């Protein structure tokens, strides 16, 4: 693990505005009721000393919260904090702008830098690793020797062939070959006053860091070692099928909660995105490929905020297309040429069938 989010010891190092962070604390107290200082620090994923204690002091000074009692902890972190009437009004104003009340986000610039430092480009598989990962599958040596360069190229891969021949199994095996490391992703991303929720418990699997249980002392150790706004996960392997549409490839804005959900390809950064049953989506294959052309070639993606502003994110994803349909029935030759590696997973030969 080469990348480790540097620890935060001052508010300035978060890259976030102090008033924005104070509003986040008020929203959490509004939703959850009175909490200890240490618990507030745990919820917003920032260290108590030097960051959360400063926020709480400022809020006390403005009479937006008050100290109820001590919960037997050491210092201010053990005190129980409660929101005041004025604090409730301020929290409601903040909630009209955004109802996000989770871990403090990481600025987009920091996220993009982290993606580059944890890039898949440096990952390589050997013939031995491939044979180990594919040992449960039977196919020709020709197919085997085409898969290796495709995986190591970190370019798009197009798997095609009749149904039941193992295309999805091959894609999953690719994941077991190259997604063995862990990476850090932020719980959420901050850009232009907007929050994009990044961590997704369905698509992201947490990779333990030594402390299996989240105790107060464990949180303090994590805060001392690295920025707790980041979560360590296994490199993602995300599958999307017929439900995929063009809207799902851009930021999804929740009109009620007033924050965004990251699209599939952003959640898959640092890993693999498998487009299963390609050609059976709710969008034409040519339109879908058109959406990928710039990201696939430039390793940069452009997403649109509801304000109309476009933001730039790193595109570090191995895209694998899998289809039962003949490639030429899906898109024209010009589009197919843009897909670097086209590999047919054909019917087994007589000898392979006997081995199966």
Regions found by a protein language model. Give the residues of each.
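Short alpha-helical segments that sit at the start of domains
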Residues: 2-25
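Short amphipathic alpha-helical elements of helix-turn-helix/winged-helix folds
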Residues: 24-32
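Short acidic, hydrophobic short linear motifs in intrinsically disordered regions
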Residues: 31-46
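Interdomain "pre-motor" coupling segment immediately N-terminal to P-loop NTPase/helicase cores
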Residues: 53-123
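Dynamic helix-loop-helix/coil hinge segments at AAA+ ATPase domain boundaries and subdomain interfaces
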Residues: 116-144
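Conserved ASCE/P-loop NTPase catalytic core
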Residues: 135-320
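Conserved AAA+ ATPase "sensor/coupling" helix adjacent to the nucleotide-binding pocket
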Residues: 294-295, 338, 355-356
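A short helix-turn-beta junction within AAA+ P-loop NTPase domains corresponding to the substrate/partner-engaging
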Residues: 331-347
